[in-house]
């Protein structure tokens, strides 16, 4: 559970975490990280690779990405990316959909 490391990350003086994995891949959420760090630590990630897989329900994928935009609004201290790796089983249309949503909603400041 990555959330157990939140206080240590903040105390360490790091100003960014990269490859930040969240639910459903890890037992923490982006909301948890924001509550712990605010915008004092830049988060790079937020898109768990499992949401790109064929077996992950398309409706949940769409919901996850839309919720991501709501959580990061207005967009301070966040760089969207796949939090681990794009795996061979990833569906390309899902990456294309993320790109579409970034084009539609990814301008600063992000509005809910």
Language-model features: where?
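Active-site loop segments of alpha/beta catalytic cores
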Residues: 1-112
